């Protein structure tokens, strides 16, 4: 499965970007997780509505999920041969109406800067990959 994180606005080249790159590299080293590609991009010109794609919007009012919920989602999507999982992180003002039809999830009740939300999401995807491959990183 290919996982993409689409972000509105600039992608800064600071410490947050370095951390994201570390987690991306670690995730891709765990081939048995089923995650074949993980990348961060600027917002696409159009949203992907393919039936082989799952789109999730990060929203403070979205469904609160935990790590094991995300693991279950990735496992189910892999089992159902879904090719792409897209996460969308918007601007502080929120999203346009183009994203209304997508499921909304939240990283928690706290508010994070968007650059830090990217890091947290990359770490959680890596954590999911370690759980799926029985790697000792995750301690439950």
Where are these regions (language model features)?
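Short glycine-/polar-rich loops that comprise or flank the Walker A/P-loop
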Residues: 1, 53, 101-102
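Short, Lys/Arg-enriched, disordered terminal segments
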Residues: 1-5, 82, 139-140
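N-terminal beta1-alpha1 ligand-phosphate binding loop
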Residues: 1-27
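Short hydrophobic segments within beta-strands
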Residues: 6-8, 58, 88
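Conserved strand-to-helix beginnings and helix N-cap segments that scaffold or border functional pockets
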Residues: 16-21, 67-71, 118
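S-adenosyl-L-methionine/SAH cofactor-binding core of RNA-modifying enzymes
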Residues: 29-86, 94
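Short Gly/Pro-enriched loop/turn and capping motifs at secondary-structure junctions
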Residues: 63, 91-95, 110-112
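Structured adenosyl-cofactor binding patch, chiefly the S-adenosyl-L-methionine
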Residues: 97-139
